[in-house]
């Protein structure tokens, strides 16, 4: 048989699907079908997982923009690139993945890395320097050392200093990469922590 004996049909990309609903149908002689089965399943399973999760997070955010930052936790470079693409299909407004941004013409956005914080003598100095560089878009990564004891308090200190200096706080916030996110978010939902 030849490759021309293989027939494939799939639903349009971005279509909402439900459990047990076929996404792709491949009709081919058994050997040809088995040759492509693993590749097709790997691509579809990973990307539909990411797009679905992104869609749920975007829906839960109720209009607040959600960004994709998954490259460092992806199962390899290709999964990072195509995971970013899937997150965009799921409704994310941007990615930190520069290659994905270039390949798929999607907005590249980001904050700073843990290495930025670690390159300064202390966390507060790193935050203050970043805030001075980006006063109109200041999002501080607060879990490099200790989220509750230093990260969030140092971020609040920097934001209060900005406000006291007359710098309008338009696009500012904190970013968490680790820990019990639900618990931390309950403690800190505004520029001043709750008691």
Model-derived segments and spans:
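Non-catalytic terminal segments and appended small domains
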Residues: 1-4, 100-102
